[in-house]
């Protein structure tokens, strides 16, 4: 099996070594498999970034799939769900930059941050932050 290129590079595995173990675990816990497009994962990650969590692309996949399963009614409003983020978005600065500057080919960012250019002075940065959030 040949893996396709993806923004979520750490899960870009064509023939995983532990595929049998993964299938056993899915069956044991009545799990399901779903996929996310590049646009879905980028927008889910960008949406999470707005909460203050700098989301990695792999967590973006999990969040995009969560949204799909909720919208299809597979996951109900009363259900309790945990999404584990195993990496910090700061390890994926290129991904974050591309998401928030609309630079991912074929993907329109719906949750991009507004860039603010500031002089490299503490007071200017502090004042800009104070204007954007309640302190």
Predicted regions located by residue number:
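Active-site/ligand-binding loops adjacent to catalytic centers
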Residues: 1-55, 99-135
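Claisen-condensing/thiolase-fold acyl-transfer catalytic domains that form or cleave C-C bonds
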Residues: 38-93
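Short amphipathic alpha-helical segments
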Residues: 95-97
């Amino acid at each position: 099996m040949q893996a396709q290129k993806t923004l979520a590079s750490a899960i870009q595995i064509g023939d995983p070594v532990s595929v049998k173990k993964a299938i056993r675990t899915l069956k044991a816990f009545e799990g399901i498999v779903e996929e996310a497009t590049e646009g879905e994962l980028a927008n889910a990650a960008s949406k999470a970034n707005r909460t203050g969590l700098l989301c990695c692309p792999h967590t973006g996949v999990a969040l995009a799939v969560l949204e799909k399963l909720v919208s299809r009614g597979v996951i109900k409003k009363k259900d309790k769900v945990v999404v584990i983020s195993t990496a910090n978005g700061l390890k994926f600065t290129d991904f974050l930059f591309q998401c928030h500057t609309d630079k991912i080919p074929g993907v329109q960012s719906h949750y991009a941050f507004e860039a603010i250019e500031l002089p490299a002075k503490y007071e200017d940065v502090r004042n800009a932050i104070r204007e954007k959030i309640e302190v």
